[in-house]
Amino acid sequence: TEYKDEVILLCRVAESVICKNEDEVCIPVVKKVDGKDEIQVITYRKSECPQLDFSDTRHVSKRGEKKSDILNLTSLSHLRIARSKDGIHFEVDEHPAIFPLAEEESWGMEDPRITKIDDIYYINYTSVTENGAGTSLISTKDFCTFERHGIIFAPENKDVTIFPQKINGKYVAFNRPVPGGIGNPQMWIAKSPDLIHWGEQRHFCGISSDTESWDDGRIGGGAVPFLTDKGWVKIYHAADRNDRYCLGAFLLDEKDPSIVLAKTKDPILEPQEKYETNGFFGNVVFTCGCLVNDNKVIIYYGAADDKICRADFELDDLFAAMEYIDI
């Protein structure tokens, strides 16, 4: 987002514990001790835990079980501010802006998205605990002091993007519930009178029925929607069944954003460069925010889960890449 004369990135910083040897896997978590939040370390020894799967660098799980049986994450994430005068060269603050609390974020904070409404910046983010990944809300006016508003979407629900103004008297947000049985991770749209209490949920968009498509695995919110003379533009992410993440875009009706006017058939950004295909979790481009200056769309995105990058588009080119839908 932009604040005064600076471009502000609110970055997820994932930190892990240095282990003594290759047999150890050390897990940082936040726990309440004598009324205070403290970081504690849980240590697994691979040789003593044959029932556990350590093959995924992101987490420890029960061997042979499904993803819902994750026991711990291997890192603990907080949110930290990076500042820039030109949108390219950033200085990262020395200390965290927001650190996880034991009650809501004992396993960390991820995927922050900033929506400016009037003079307040609302930050929704994924709050992770052993009970699942939900979405919480924080607000600020100056990026120095922050007010917590708690969980607004209970687990498992993430990839929330809030529209920057009321529509027909209510706040509107995309969200992405993750069903455990029937269904797939798909986009829903909800409404709220106050940004805290959300309801009127409606299914918005599902995954592609084409099993060879770039978006046949999962789909979710990306950047905060922005308004143009043609309607709302919503840049989103999707993945195929091999977890290759790309970005696409919707054009939505100004007065009813549940109506899709047009969408991109092919990705507008996909992992091609080495820094996008290789990394902590390769073949990923994933955005949580963008800026719009005149006809230019500036997307800040994560690459391979361990870098932050920038890509610029002409808005006219984005519209030209869309296929319009008969309503």
Language-model-derived ranges and their functions:
Residues P112-R113, T161-P164, G222-V224, V285-V292:
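Beta-rich, blade/repeat-based domains predominating
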Residues E2-W107, T115-T161, Q165-G217, L227-F280, ...:
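Beta-rich carbohydrate-recognition and catalytic domains
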